[in-house]
Amino acid sequence: MSPKTETKASVGFKAGVKDYRLTYYTPEYQTKDTDILAAFRVTPQPGVPPEEAGAAVAAESSTGTWTTVWTDGLTSLDRYKGRCYDIEPVPGEETQFIAYVAYPLDLFEEGSVTNLFTSIVGNVFGFKALRALRLEDLRIPPSYSKTFQGPPHGIQVERDKLNKYGRPLLGCTIKPKLGLSAKNYGRAVYECLRGGLDFTKDDENVNSQPFMRWRDRFVFCAEALNKAQAETGEIKGHYLNATAGTCEEMMKRAIFARELGVPIVMHDYLTGGFTANTSLAHYCRDNGLLLHIHRAMHAVIDRQRNHGMHFRVLAKALRMSGGDHIHAGTVVGKLEGERDVTLGFVDLLRDDFIEKDRSRGIYFTQDWVSMPGVLPVASGGIHVWHMPALTEIFGDDSVLQFGGGTLGHPWGNAPGAVANRVALEACVQARNEGRDLAREGNEVIREACKWSPELAAACEIWKEIKFEFDVIDRL
């Protein structure tokens, strides 16, 4: 290159490495109604100031890189950069703090959770200057949430489709989760639905394995629910898992489910991916299918307190991507879930407007501007003795799902379903009469046992079953 045309480092911009905080830490910034706001729990490496660590998060999740580049001069960084606008300590943690970051809306593609997460929870989580990083919450402005379809139908439309009101819905995951033939699987579905459940469910890892191919399962399950509907006079459903190795195969399964006339399909939204999930949600709305969502893999992402992403963020992402149900823990069962934290993200799933409430882990006020709500599903290690607590904790707009708590009944699947239905209706009646389920719940169940031998047998077999471990994710 001739000396006349050689680009000098001193011409046009000043090369080198600058502290992130000089550009991306802006405590004077006033957030806009259109900004996407994030609350990160940051654990910097020793010697890294909080302001520099917070600014690094803002930079690396938006426009920044490790050095100054000449193409910075071709755009407006002030318009597009993320900004760390506040830092606060974490009580009881000397090495951690909460960094609040504001992102301008133009950084993100409309209607794409995939693009949103690629920026905000992308490479920045491997940044060497940070020992750990956790995304605690996101504020999604109406100007962005309105670019999403959201749930295919929502809570009220689902109740209208099922013609079921005034109580939680009852479900059951078919067990053993793997190994049954399609015909035996369909038989278990029929027995549970005939006994009084509203739904049965494929487990998350039931896809199309050698022992039971998906098409055979779909056909036998459709036959089972049609037979149960005819006998009970109630609308029934089975969550047919459409999750597959490719989006094309997933859609093929959803289309076949619709052709069978079933009311609901299922997807593993984290292992399947947000792009696939959003596509399936759009298909379900267009074709009248409800969509049940399983959160398999969530604990890999959300269980550790100092690194990853809290489930409340995954819950918001699912509401935008689309789903009518999602598993949300139980508080009282075998899976992780502290009560206040769980109820915080349950409200974020169901309600239209949720106020900031740090006592429940909600860092920002969230306005969903009439986006349909999602039914939380309580599932995992629950049985009839848990029914009063579940009814009191989750209320009517929920699905209470008993797998082993139905199929483990000593008299069989149908009596197990009867026991759960009787226990639920007893709890709902007691609550409606003004009784305190938190205090009188066990007595309500014992009274119901007097006129339901199925419930009495269930109470006897599970009277000693408890899962008493401290939760990891506390506020």
From Swiss-Prot:
<keyword id="KW-0150">Chloroplast</keyword>
<keyword id="KW-0456">Lyase</keyword>
<dbReference type="GO" id="GO:0009507">
    <property type="term" value="C:chloroplast"/>
</dbReference>
<feature type="binding site">
    <location>
        <position position="204"/>
    </location>
    <ligand>
        <name>Mg(2+)</name>
    </ligand>
</feature>
<dbReference type="Pfam" id="PF02788">
    <property type="entry name" value="RuBisCO_large_N"/>
</dbReference>
<feature type="binding site">
    <location>
        <position position="177"/>
    </location>
    <ligand>
        <name>substrate</name>
    </ligand>
</feature>
<keyword id="KW-0479">Metal-binding</keyword>
<keyword id="KW-0934">Plastid</keyword>
<dbReference type="InterPro" id="IPR020878">
    <property type="entry name" value="RuBisCo_large_chain_AS"/>
</dbReference>
<keyword id="KW-0601">Photorespiration</keyword>
<keyword id="KW-1015">Disulfide bond</keyword>
<keyword id="KW-0120">Carbon dioxide fixation</keyword>
<dbReference type="GO" id="GO:0000287">
    <property type="term" value="F:magnesium ion binding"/>
</dbReference>
<dbReference type="InterPro" id="IPR000685">
    <property type="entry name" value="RuBisCO_lsu_C"/>
</dbReference>
<keyword id="KW-0007">Acetylation</keyword>
<keyword id="KW-0113">Calvin cycle</keyword>
<feature type="binding site">
    <location>
        <position position="173"/>
    </location>
    <ligand>
        <name>substrate</name>
    </ligand>
</feature>
<dbReference type="InterPro" id="IPR017443">
    <property type="entry name" value="RuBisCO_lsu_fd_N"/>
</dbReference>
<dbReference type="InterPro" id="IPR036376">
    <property type="entry name" value="RuBisCO_lsu_C_sf"/>
</dbReference>
<feature type="binding site">
    <location>
        <position position="203"/>
    </location>
    <ligand>
        <name>Mg(2+)</name>
    </ligand>
</feature>
<feature type="modified residue" description="N6-carboxylysine">
    <location>
        <position position="201"/>
    </location>
</feature>
<dbReference type="GO" id="GO:0019253">
    <property type="term" value="P:reductive pentose-phosphate cycle"/>
</dbReference>
<comment type="subunit">
    <text>Heterohexadecamer of 8 large chains and 8 small chains; disulfide-linked. The disulfide link is formed within the large subunit homodimers.</text>
</comment>
<feature type="binding site">
    <location>
        <position position="327"/>
    </location>
    <ligand>
        <name>substrate</name>
    </ligand>
</feature>
<feature type="binding site" description="in homodimeric partner">
    <location>
        <position position="123"/>
    </location>
    <ligand>
        <name>substrate</name>
    </ligand>
</feature>
<feature type="modified residue" description="N6,N6,N6-trimethyllysine">
    <location>
        <position position="14"/>
    </location>
</feature>
<dbReference type="GO" id="GO:0004497">
    <property type="term" value="F:monooxygenase activity"/>
</dbReference>
<keyword id="KW-0503">Monooxygenase</keyword>
<dbReference type="Pfam" id="PF00016">
    <property type="entry name" value="RuBisCO_large"/>
</dbReference>
<keyword id="KW-0560">Oxidoreductase</keyword>
<keyword id="KW-0460">Magnesium</keyword>
<feature type="active site" description="Proton acceptor">
    <location>
        <position position="294"/>
    </location>
</feature>
<feature type="binding site" description="via carbamate group">
    <location>
        <position position="201"/>
    </location>
    <ligand>
        <name>Mg(2+)</name>
    </ligand>
</feature>
<protein>
    <recommendedName>
        <fullName>Ribulose bisphosphate carboxylase large chain</fullName>
        <ecNumber>4.1.1.39</ecNumber>
    </recommendedName>
</protein>
<feature type="binding site">
    <location>
        <position position="295"/>
    </location>
    <ligand>
        <name>substrate</name>
    </ligand>
</feature>
<keyword id="KW-0602">Photosynthesis</keyword>
<dbReference type="InterPro" id="IPR033966">
    <property type="entry name" value="RuBisCO"/>
</dbReference>
<comment type="function">
    <text>RuBisCO catalyzes two reactions: the carboxylation of D-ribulose 1,5-bisphosphate, the primary event in carbon dioxide fixation, as well as the oxidative fragmentation of the pentose substrate in the photorespiration process. Both reactions occur simultaneously and in competition at the same active site.</text>
</comment>
<dbReference type="InterPro" id="IPR036422">
    <property type="entry name" value="RuBisCO_lsu_N_sf"/>
</dbReference>
<feature type="modified residue" description="N-acetylproline">
    <location>
        <position position="3"/>
    </location>
</feature>
<dbReference type="GO" id="GO:0009853">
    <property type="term" value="P:photorespiration"/>
</dbReference>
<keyword id="KW-0488">Methylation</keyword>
